[in-house]
Amino acid sequence: FVLNYHPENPAEEIFRSYQEYEKKFGEPHQKEWVAHSNSLDESRRLKVGYVSPDFRSHSCTYFMEPLLSHHDHGKVDVYAYADLTQEDAVTARYKGYVEHWIPTRGMSDAALAQRIRADGIDILVDLAGHTSGNRLGVFARKPAPVSLSWMGYGYTTGLRAIDYYLTDEASAPQGSEHLFSEEPWRLKDTPYAVYRPGPGMGEVNPLPALERGYITLGTLTRGVRVNHRTIKVWSDILKRLPTAHIVIDSASFKDPTVQQAAIDKFEAHGIDKSRLHIGYNSPPWDVLRGIDIGLDCFPHNSGTTLFETLYMGLPYVTLAGRPSVGRIGSAILHGLGREQWIASSEQEYVDKVVELASDTAALAQLRASLRQQMQGSKLMD
């Protein structure tokens, strides 16, 4: 999990660690791969099972719910294998989208794999990858004839037992197949995920720079994504925009010690702390109301917060990097039809942010129209 955030390691080196994971935790279970007896009758409904610890109030809801709520139940019989410590109101909604709700907390991987096989699942979907609460040990036993990983993690699982990694051309371009244990299944003419905003985000406000007289840049990302490379690039931008401020706001920066460590790194590049606003405020969309231009991180891009950034009327600039966690920002912008905000180098990233900041009238127009554009785009279809 953490290796994906390494600012220097090349993609091939990181993938080798996934191959080691397969040797230790995947290959020992290949003896449990046995032929499946699923009916080949094309007239019957397909049994599709989703395995997740996040059928609750969680950022994954913004992407899982649009899919689960739109299944054609005349063609698909939906199973949810829910590994939850507690349920909430969102859980209740999920239960309404599926025919079969199976709590799996406390069930061993072997027992759950046996249950999935007994249920006759045709397609089994992993929604967690290597995140907390995953059941990759179940997938290693290949309890369904077809399995795939999607969305919750953002990269390969390393398991050869999983057949496909559901993605798109922008996230996993042609030629990147050697970086996945699964076969990349690229959605055509649509992004890898669509977004349904959460409640309470409110309306888009006018561009803050019009009132303040200076540009505010910002990110809502976790601290693990903010490394020495991003700080240098953001410092270079602040040098090019001498009146601009930057907001770095997430739960990672609640601790004053962490805040000061980030300030020290910017000051080492000659940026005065009076231009830095580092901390944690909630809800995040209220923070976005005070920002003019969003900044994506690299080499591991942000995720949900990029959708929120656009939805609140802010353009953002991203650096396209290694598949696929380094191309999340690019995939989202491709879905929006705003490829001009994708940089291919750190210098181009700086230039694109400076270019956006140089035209406040255009930024104000973007602020007023971007949500409507997003709602009519593939990102929310």
Model-derived regions, located:
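Substrate-binding clefts and catalytic carboxylate motifs of secreted carbohydrate-active enzymes
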Residues: 218-229
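Residues at the starts of beta-strands that form the adenosine-phosphate
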Residues: 77, 243-245
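Short alpha-helix at the nucleotide-sugar/activated-sugar donor binding site of glycosyltransferases
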Residues: 309-311, 334
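Short hydrophobic "strand-cap" motifs at the C-terminus of beta-strands
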Residues: 51, 220-222, 249, 279
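Glycosyltransferase donor-sugar binding loop
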Residues: 82-86, 245-260
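Alpha-helical solenoid repeat scaffolds of the TPR/TPR-like class and their adjacent stem/linker regions
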Residues: 1-214, 232, 264-271, 282-293, ...
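Short acidic/histidine- and often glycine-rich active-site loop of Leloir-type glycosyltransferases
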Residues: 326-337
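Short hydrophobic beta-strand element within catalytic cores of glycosyltransferases
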Residues: 315-324
